């Protein structure tokens, strides 16, 4: 294993540890971007390349029929893909370069849903990922896939994880 691979693996372990410290808690207390805090999801499970989140569908997330808005579904899955990508341990934050969504079901205001992000393939520059929204009965609401480009941008929560490792 190269020195770079070891560095990536250690950062992955730190990110997973940080996310596990927030497991079951509302994300509003996490050093996340404003949109993530607004979604106010909870981390249910996390491992390298995979994360499961849960959130309550609120009125401001609905379309005129009282169902989870399609644009919101895209945003939730993109956010899940983004935060899941940080478990890979790369120094920079991967950004979406495309995104495809299939809307397959519906969920009402007041219901909880789970969002599952997974890495399908890690390339040298591009990461292919998927996300699914499922209701609490396991019914698939939406499925999406995205390709992400590795960048040099370091988000605040990666900086927090890196600082935590310096304290020990």
What residue spans do the PLM features occupy?
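Terminal targeting signals and extreme-terminal segments of soluble enzymes
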Residues: 1-168
């Amino acid at each position: 294993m190269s020195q770079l691979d070891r560095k990536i693996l250690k950062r992955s372990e730190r990110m997973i540890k940080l996310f596990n410290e927030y497991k079951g808690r509302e994300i509003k207390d996490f050093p996340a971007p404003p949109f993530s805090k607004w979604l106010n999801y909870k981390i249910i499970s996390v491992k390298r390349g995979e994360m499961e989140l849960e959130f309550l569908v609120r009125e401001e997330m609905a379309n005129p029929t009282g169902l989870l808005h399609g644009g919101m579904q895209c945003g939730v899955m993109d956010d899940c893909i983004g935060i899941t990508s940080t478990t890979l341990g790369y120094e920079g934050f991967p950004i979406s370069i495309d995104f495809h969504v299939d809307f397959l079901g519906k969920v009402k205001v007041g219901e909880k849903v789970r969002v599952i992000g997974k890495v399908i393939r890690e390339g040298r520059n591009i990461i292919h990922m998927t996300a699914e929204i499922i209701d609490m009965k396991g019914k698939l609401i939406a499925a999406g896939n995205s390709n992400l480009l590795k960048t040099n941008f370091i988000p605040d929560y990666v900086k927090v994880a890196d600082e935590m490792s310096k304290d020990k």
